[in-house]
Amino acid sequence: MQVGVFIPIGNNGWLISETSPQYMPSFELNKEITQKAETYGFDFALSMIKLRGFGGKTQFWEHNLESFTLMAGLAAVTSKIKIFATVATLTIPPAIVARMASTIDSIAPGRFGVNLVTGWQKAEYSQMGLWPGEAHYTDRYNYLAEYTTVLKDLLETGVSDFKGKYFTMDDCRVSPHPKETKLICAGSSDEGLAFTAQYADYSFALGKGTNTPTAFASVNKRLEAAAEKTGRDVQSFILFMIIADETDEKAMAKWQSYRDGADQEALAWLTQQAAPNAKAGATTNTQQLAAPESAVNLNMGTLVGSYESIAKMLDEIAAVPGTAGVLLVFDDFLRGVEDFGTRIQPLMKSRT
């Protein structure tokens, strides 16, 4: 099973809490995390893109770096680990993304990939006049299909003459073009999985619940069904937060402390922003992100326990059919990557 790190490009990582570690994003922090991950054999590092935060007492995600420029820097200071940047497809034309991907591939040959997101938080785009209107919630995958068609044309052949509703290419060219650029799509709705099965190499999905490592299995089954229709082999990377310590009790006490300190003002903003996307159905990622059960960490799957307990749960995840790997976040990234490399990974059957 592959293991990746979802690096903290935004302040405070993925805990919307007043009692979790508080920090600003920086190149130096993410360089140290990524180089440490490479040392311990992590397969890839991925960064998100976030253009507007949730506010609150912690100013959650109000401070963010930009994904492509950050990953270009990290590509230059690493040698083996794969590097994925995220593009908010409403903000950057596909021809420019193709040229940026070509440039980063020149820095790190064969190591760069792109994560595609359609955009769901209206405030990110309306603040700069880029929100296309409420119809985007229901038409976004039609837009993304055209976007990705152009992007793949340019990445694979260096030329696109695509003519569509949203994009018109007239002998558009990108050279040099990389030999292979893997594409990831984050989406758990039926429409999102259908798109991934047709266009992407990997699906990026949220784990579910606390210490329920295989609860996401139905998403893999739905992706498999979608991939059968396209005849393509597409597997999943599943996102989990790890909160580990010497004992289960110590780890659970930390998790409870973070929950007790939840930034309610920021969580209210998250719920408000996610509401319009609810029309897309209960299987969307944003429905899960804002659910009240564990919004403090965006309701991603959470593994809490001793190093031994975490290793066993990760092996359970690896055994779920269709799982290519896990994408990990930590309450404390530097310590978390260190503990994973020295205390958790050596106990995993799926990593030996």
Curated annotation (Swiss-Prot):
Q: Which Pfam families match?
A: Bac_luciferase
Q: A Gene Ontology molecular-function term?
A: alkanesulfonate monooxygenase activity
Annotated FMN binding lies at I49, K50, N115, E124, R140, Y141, S189
What is catalyzed by this enzyme?
uracil + FMNH2 + NADH + O2 = (Z)-3-ureidoacrylate + FMN + NAD(+) + H2O + H(+); thymine + FMNH2 + NADH + O2 = (Z)-2-methylureidoacrylate + FMN + NAD(+) + H2O + H(+)
Extract the PANTHER family matched here.
Answer: ALKANESULFONATE MONOOXYGENASE (PTHR42847), ALKANESULFONATE MONOOXYGENASE-RELATED (PTHR42847:SF4)
User: Would you identify the family this protein belongs to, as annotated?
Assistant: Belongs to the NtaA/SnaA/DszA monooxygenase family. RutA subfamily.
The name on file for this protein is: Pyrimidine monooxygenase RutA
Organism listed in the record: Caulobacter segnis (strain ATCC 21756 / DSM 7131 / JCM 7823 / NBRC 15250 / LMG 17158 / TK0059) (Mycoplana segnis)
Q: What is the lineage of its organism?
A: Bacteria, Pseudomonadati, Pseudomonadota, Alphaproteobacteria, Caulobacterales
